[in-house]
Amino acid sequence: ATSIALKIHFPLAWAVKPTLYKQFVGGETLQDCSAAINHLMKYNVKSTLDYSAESEQTPEGIQATFEETLRSIDFAKGNTNLAYAVFKPSTITTDELLAKASEKREELTIDDVRHFREFRERFMALCQRAYDNDVRILVDAEDYCFQDAIDALTDEAMRKFNKKRAIVFATLQMYRHDRMPYLRRIYDDAVAKGYIAGVKFVRGAYMEAERARAAALDYPDPICKDKQATDENY
């Protein structure tokens, strides 16, 4: 029913806001979130600021998301009720570029290289702002086809900003069977280069889509063979 209503542009806010909205959304602005943040802290539960609005992957949409994420990092400065800020790399570039940079780097055009450089600058600017404000920041995990490029930038950011304490955190989806070897590489690199690895563990969020894509494009399934294997990784 909800999907039909959205297709025909039927107004749902009157029903969603008092029900589902209250369960899943802290607020529409940073200031709106303050009440929920303060309420949770009464139970010794810290919050994480996550700008989850879906914007178009246009230059204007990407810039708007980037600027709002910067504001969320500034908002978290000195706020002991907040545990982390977070950003989703695919919201500050395009899916097409992330997939190409991860899987077909040899096919990157001059324009692709320029756009990736701009993406890297935005990525590092968010981490720099987190470092300057002493705010820990989570780099959200994404689809398998995007992750190699994200991992490379996250590794670079950890080497730069995690010298004294963990500021930048990678997110590892442990239903992927390649995440344990990657975790070992992070650890070895941190020891060798003298920084503190920041790692957040999650089980994973895209299993059906990942398996369907692997089958469609005929590459090995990146997901663990069963729940037990995921549990052991996690």
Enumerate the predicted regions with their spans.
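Positively charged, amphipathic and often flexible ligand-engagement surfaces
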Residues: 1-234
